[in-house]
């Protein structure tokens, strides 16, 4: 994560009126279903729009699904410390969160929702501190996760095992998050997450 002066950091925080809600989870945890439910609950939530260096697909539009940058533009913005977090998933294929875009949403009073990998989630929580709530969604067990991924019927066995290995790594980050939601019952997990977020948003 980039280093900013204390003055700039405090000034930036002072200008913000919205809050941040960060979600991370292993694939197959039910995170996306929970997030989509929360977006219907009149909490003034707005999804963070990521930047990427991949080309648009189909009807995707710049500034709607993603901010589309060339690899050169992305690297230039990295050098200028414009990202809260970013990842190069493979050569010249970047994804990241632009600080300027998040601050625009916060200044509008929106509560910004992030769906990030564990490292990106921890970085944003560290940057924004108490203004951010970090939530880790996890399955009740690795065996249950394996059953869910197998039940999808979309991945080959070797792909599933790679996802399981990644999940085991990601779950080691759970203690770094403010709250851990164990999704062994989807409706209960949705209700628990909603209450956690309401409590957070109502805090001064």
Swiss-Prot record:
Q: Which domain of life is it from?
A: Bacteria
Q: Which reaction(s) does its UniProt entry say it catalyses?
A: GMP + ATP = GDP + ADP
**Where does the Guanylate kinase-like domain lie?**
18-198
InterPro entries on file: GK/Ca_channel_bsu (IPR008145), Guanylate_kin-like_dom (IPR008144), Guanylate_kinase (IPR017665), Guanylate_kinase_CS (IPR020590), P-loop_NTPase (IPR027417)
GO CC, one annotated term: cytosol
List, alphabetically, the SUPFAM superfamilies matched: P-loop containing nucleoside triphosphate hydrolases (SSF52540)
The primary location reported for this protein is cytoplasm
Q: Which NCBIfam families match?
A: guanyl_kin (TIGR03263)
> What the protein does?
Essential for recycling GMP and indirectly, cGMP.
Identification of the protein by name:
Guanylate kinase
Q: What is the species listed in this Swiss-Prot or TrEMBL entry?
A: Bacteroides thetaiotaomicron (strain ATCC 29148 / DSM 2079 / JCM 5827 / CCUG 10774 / NCTC 10582 / VPI-5482 / E50)
């Amino acid at each position: 994560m980039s280093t900013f002066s204390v003055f700039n950091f405090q000034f930036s925080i002072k200008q913000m009126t919205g809050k941040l809600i960060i979600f991370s989870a292993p694939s197959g945890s039910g995170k996306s279903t929970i997030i989509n439910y929360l977006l219907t609950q009149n909490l003034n939530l707005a999804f963070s729009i990521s930047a990427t260096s991949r080309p648009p697909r189909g009807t995707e539009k710049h500034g709607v699904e993603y901010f589309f940058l060339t690899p050169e533009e992305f690297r230039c913005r990295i050098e200028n410390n414009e990202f809260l977090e970013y990842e190069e998933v493979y050569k010249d294929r970047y994804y990241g969160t632009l600080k300027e875009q998040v601050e625009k949403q916060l200044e509008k009073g929106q509560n910004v929702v992030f769906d990030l990998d564990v490292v990106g989630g921890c970085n944003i929580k560290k940057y924004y501190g108490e203004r951010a709530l970090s939530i880790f969604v996890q399955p009740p067990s690795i065996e249950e996760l394996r059953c869910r991924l197998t039940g999808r019927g979309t991945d080959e066995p070797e792909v599933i095992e790679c996802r399981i290995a990644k999940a085991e790594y990601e779950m080691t980050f759970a203690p770094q998050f403010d709250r851990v939601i164990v999704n062994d019952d989807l409706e209960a997990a949705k209700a628990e997450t909603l209450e956690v977020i309401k409590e957070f948003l109502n805090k001064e």
